[in-house]
């Protein structure tokens, strides 16, 4: 597959004609050859977005809604293509890729529904014969930097919400998924959005830092949203702060699933398997910690292992219905093996699976994990999860909160009041009582606490993220002033 940059409604090569390759993590075959953007291209994209903003901000809500609904329809019509491309680029199963397209279409439809919900309010004033009000206005060109793992849906939210609020977008895709991100851009183009409203860039890892620097500092860019690692997100936040530009950051996660002693064990096991191993555990809200009451831990682990061993593994390009595919890079396997070996050396027990071989790793469960093990609090981002045994509700809460991250979580227990008490006590942006940690609905705010970042995608929260609030008064000509 070959892809280009998309600037001002034209698919173009990079200004220096250079390309980079996305290599399959197992076969080492070249999957995609992508145009390799330069700083010159990045500035050109920002300028196109600024020029388009002059007219796009004045487009009425009904027209913005119509166009975003059209994008959703176009995306759904290309579902087979998305499944094919995501399997080749990021090892996505048909299940994960199909969900991504469905969720992405929902994001564009939810965004479309917000077109007439961007509202101000009237404010009581002490000034006679004066009307005081607030308005919500678009902020200008938005820089959206998107990762590879939720390949379609994370791009959709970074595009749709700024657009419905009247902004334009410079979309920086991931070097791991250039064809998928170009396909999303193509959907927006086919829906008929005006030139410059969406501009797409991609670049090799060695060029990406200078391109990000150039865009963050560009006078045309007004706000930034980034989904990715906490390390990179922190760098972006610091650079944005130098230019007094607001960020929305959705970063790392170490999501816990708490299983209380009165839980429905079979239901908890189903949620644990789904949350731990969907897309090889490479989801920011994947279940990386099972915090299980010691009274039921043996039964839970036995059933968890039994169900996990039934998961099918393979190459989605060959076996589309497999659940466990390759990780995005052989480097992932090397990193996880380091965490695995450290845990075993310190007393953890392997109850399912084993070491990774390059980008391939079986669904793996470690039991009896303790706080002195690196895997206790380091993000794994692969098909491995851990069981941490606890004594009672209070210790479960303490362990859940013993993390620098705070994205998603789950609590299983039959006593709903008790489960709710636990849910209110843990420091996470999302808490699901008797549900998996892996959940997302376009109408519900999504984000986290602590090192997971700040700001929220989805739901009405995006209106604050992608608009400016303005105080406006209409006053009588004749007024009394003190001098």
Swiss-Prot record:
Biochemical pathway: Aromatic compound metabolism; naphthalene degradation
Residues the entry annotates as binding NAD(+): 228-233
Disulfide bonds: none
Record field: catalytic activity: salicylaldehyde + NAD(+) + H2O = salicylate + NADH + 2 H(+)
GO molecular function term, any single one: salicylaldehyde dehydrogenase (NAD+) activity
Keyword terms: Aromatic hydrocarbons catabolism, NAD, Oxidoreductase, Plasmid
List of catalytic residues: 250, 284
Extra information: Encoded on an unnamed 75 kb plasmid.
Family (UniProt): Belongs to the aldehyde dehydrogenase family.
Protein name: Salicylaldehyde dehydrogenase
Encoding gene, per UniProt annotation: doxF
């Amino acid at each position: 597959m070959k892809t280009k940059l998309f600037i001002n409604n034209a698919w173009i090569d990079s200004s220096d004609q250079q390309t980079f390759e996305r290599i399959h993590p197992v076969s080492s075959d070249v999957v995609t050859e992508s145009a390799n953007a330069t700083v010159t291209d990045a500035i050109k994209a920002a300028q196109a977005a600024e020029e388009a903003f002059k007219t796009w901000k004045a487009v009425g809500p009904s027209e913005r809604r119509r166009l975003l609904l059209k994008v959703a329809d176009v995306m759904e019509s290309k579902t087979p293509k998305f499944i094919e491309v995501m399997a080749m680029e990021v090892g996505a199963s048909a299940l994960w890729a199909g969900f991504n397209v469905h969720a992405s279409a929902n994001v564009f439809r939810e965004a479309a529904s917000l077109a007439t919900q961007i509202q101000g309010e009237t404010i009581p004033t002490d000034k006679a014969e004066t009307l005081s009000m607030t308005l919500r206005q678009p902020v200008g060109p938005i820089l959206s930097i998107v990762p590879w793992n939720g390949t379609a849906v994370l791009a959709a939210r970074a595009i749709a919400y700024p657009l419905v609020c009247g902004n334009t977008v410079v979309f920086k895709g991931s070097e791991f998924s250039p064809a998928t991100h170009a396909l999303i851009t193509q959907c927006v183009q086919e829906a008929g959005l005006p030139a410059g409203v969406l501009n797409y860039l991609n670049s090799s890892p060695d060029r990406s830092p200078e391109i990000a620097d150039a865009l963050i500092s560009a006078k045309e860019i007004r706000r930034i949203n980034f989904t990715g690692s906490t390390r990179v997100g922190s760098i972006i936040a610091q650079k944005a702060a130098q230019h007094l530009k607001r960020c929305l950051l959705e970063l790392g996660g170490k999501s816990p699933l708490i299983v209380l002693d009165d839980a429905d064990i079979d239901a908890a096991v189903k949620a644990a398997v789904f949350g731990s191993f969907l897309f090889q555990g490479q989801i920011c809200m994947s279940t990386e910690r099972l915090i299980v009451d010691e009274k039921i831990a043996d039964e839970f682990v036995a059933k968890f292992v039994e169900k996990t061993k039934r998961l099918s593994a393979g190459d989605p390009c060959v076996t589309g219905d497999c659940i466990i595919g390759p990780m995005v890079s052989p480097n992932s396997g090397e990193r996880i093996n380091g965490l695995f070996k450290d845990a075993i050396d310190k007393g953890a027990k392997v109850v399912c699976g084993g070491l990774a071989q390059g980008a391939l790793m079986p669904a793996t469960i470690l039991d009896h994990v303790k706080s002195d093990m690196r895997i206790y609090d380091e993000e794994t981002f692969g098909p491995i999860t851990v069981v941490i045994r606890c004594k009672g509700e209070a210790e479960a809460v303490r362990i859940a909160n013993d993390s620098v991250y705070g994205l998603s979580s789950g609590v299983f227990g039959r006593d709903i009041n008790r489960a709710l008490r636990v849910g209110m006590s843990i420091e996470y942006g999302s808490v699901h009582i008797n549900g998996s940690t892996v959940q997302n609905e376009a109408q519900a705010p999504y984000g986290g606490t602590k090192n997971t970042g700040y700001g929220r995608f989805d739901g009405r929260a995006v209106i604050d993220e992608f608009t400016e609030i303005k105080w406006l008064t209409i006053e009588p000509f004749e007024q009394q002033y003190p001098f």
